[in-house]
Amino acid sequence: MAKLSKRMKLVRDSVDASKEYEINEAVVLLQKLATAKFTESIDVSVNLGVDPRRSDQNVRGATVLPHGTGRTVRVAVFTQGANAEAAKAAGADIVGMDDLAAQVKAGELNFDVVIASPDAMRVVGQLGQILGPRGLMPNPKVGTVTPDVATAVKNAKAGQIRYRNDKNGIIHSTIGKVTFTPVQIRENLEALLAALIKGKPSGAKGQFLKRISLSTTMGAGLKVDTSSVKATVA
């Protein structure tokens, strides 16, 4: 039998796999178990009461977390004219049109979010095979194709997350770092849940938020007692 590492022993001795943890208790325990040599993220998985095989029950959107994600986000914007100046003033890291497209085609993808004004989609549309597989393709459904590029840049910099359920109807997202306080993590989680409830498909029947679990980048998952989190009645 393989010898358990100190980390795995700590997890084994600390986590009750059958328990649903109160949100603050869950965060404190995750922080205790976060022993990696880097600052781990805290991630959430939310099982939704949807049928992901039906296109009208897929959930997709974006929301700004009140305390951000703890990440420094680099933003690229495809736009021109006055919008280009507005994007730069809002904090965009890279702004351009054909010149920016050339950088992307050359493999220079040193950004985390791509935003485009509608008039720039003629250029961005040529980059679908590069941006799409990386989850970077601008989309109006999540606010990354918009005439108001300045607000989109500010949202991205402020900690906006984009989410989409997977083939099993589960939403996965990062909601902070282990250095955040339990209150910050709870409020970020509540903001995400409120956005999910707001976007609940009309065809979804029964309980919408079925199960919530938290984990760290390198750690075990903990089930969360949904009654300890606001905005979970759905």
UniProtKB/Swiss-Prot annotation:
Q: Which UniProt keywords apply?
A: Repressor, Ribonucleoprotein, Ribosomal protein, RNA-binding, rRNA-binding, Translation regulation, tRNA-binding
Which is one Gene Ontology cellular component term of this protein?
cytosolic large ribosomal subunit
Pfam families (alphabetical)? Ribosomal_L1
**Tell me, what is one Gene Ontology molecular-function annotation carried by this entry?**
rRNA binding
Question: Which CDD domains does the UniProt record give?
Answer: Ribosomal_L1 (cd00403)
Q: Which domain of life is it from?
A: Bacteria
Q: Which family does it belong to?
A: Belongs to the universal ribosomal protein uL1 family.
- What does the record note on quaternary structure? Part of the 50S ribosomal subunit.
What function is annotated for this protein? Answer: Binds directly to 23S rRNA. The L1 stalk is quite mobile in the ribosome, and is involved in E site tRNA release. Protein L1 is also a translational repressor protein, it controls the translation of the L11 operon by binding to its mRNA.
Q: What is this protein called?
A: Large ribosomal subunit protein uL1
